[in-house]
Regions:
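Outer-membrane beta-barrel translocator domains and adjoining extracellular loop/strand segments
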Residues: 3-10, 39, 47-54, 88, ...
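Membrane-embedded beta-barrel scaffold of Gram-negative outer-membrane proteins
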Residues: 13-66, 81
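Outer-membrane beta-barrel strand-turn architecture
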Residues: 18, 28-32, 43, 62, ...
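Residues that define the transmembrane beta-barrel architecture of outer-membrane proteins
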Residues: 18-22, 29, 60-66, 105-111, ...
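Residues on the lipid-exposed face of transmembrane beta-strands in outer-membrane beta-barrel proteins
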Residues: 24-28, 66-72, 83, 113-117, ...
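Outer-envelope beta-barrel architecture signal
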Residues: 31-35, 77-81, 109-111, 122-126, ...
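Gram-negative outer-membrane beta-barrel transporters
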Residues: 40-43, 56-139, 179
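C-terminal beta-signal and adjacent terminal beta-strands/loops
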Residues: 75, 132-139, 161-220
């Protein structure tokens, strides 16, 4: 694909960036269970790179890892369990990264656990979500090397409630990071990058017009 327009404006001779991707995976599906695994490798060439002489297409990098997903509805009646995990090793030499290193946005471990329990008589689904990510890399000038340190891991516990008020109305409420953890999303000049708010609340009412029902009641 073409480099970002702001880089082309500075250096029109930049080449199109290239990516080669290889994937292999498999899945298993049985009564109430679904498992999936995928391994991947990506190789990047002709990335935009800052040099003393200006912008060039001499950047390169790679990304490899595995994505795992497990879904199980057979552990307990009315309970749905979803577990996902990804492992990623990513390195780039591009833009201001003058040596092959892990970019600021790349986290090595990411995982989430979602539990949904249906209260059939109350026509309500209660959801609990736990999210985790290993620390984001950042440059610590006290240490040698580039992007040589990590922030503390990301963690968030979220809650959600979905209520089928009528056959045509669904009410949904959710709250993120209910434990009010101070998560960092990187550091610049030693100062942590924080979210504008530690947690968020959401309340939505969904009404279906022109149909017999908003949702299949049997799912509640």
């Amino acid at each position: 694909q073409l480099p970002n327009a702001k880089y082309l404006a500075q250096q029109p001779s930049l080449l199109s960036e290239a990516c080669r991707q290889y994937n292999v995976g498999g899945l298993y599906k049985a009564a109430g269970r679904f498992y999936k695994a995928e391994f991947y490798y990506k190789k990047y060439d002709r990335l935009v790179l800052y040099t003393p002489a200006g912008l060039t297409s001499g950047g390169y990098g790679s990304s490899k890892g595995v994505d795992l997903y497990f879904e199980d509805r057979s552990l307990m009646r009315n309970l749905e369990c979803n577990l996902s995990y990804s492992f990623n090793l990513s390195q780039r030499k591009y833009l201001e990264y003058t040596e092959l290193t892990t970019p600021q946005y790349a986290t090595r471990h990411n995982a989430s656990l979602v539990l949904k329990y249906s209260l059939t008589k109350l026509r309500t689904i209660v959801a609990l979500t736990e999210r985790f990510a290993s620390g984001r890399p950042y440059h610590n000038p006290v240490r040698s090397g580039l992007m040589n340190d990590e922030t503390k891991p990301y963690n968030s516990l979220d809650l959600g409630f979905t209520f089928l008020a009528t056959k045509k109305m669904i009410i949904h409420a959710s709250a993120t990071n209910v434990l009010c953890r101070k998560n960092e999303f990187g550091r610049i000049d030693g100062k942590p990058l924080l979210a504008s708010s530690d947690h968020f609340f959401y309340l939505g009412v969904f009404i279906t017009l022109g149909k017999k029902a908003a949702y299949d009641v049997s799912n509640f």
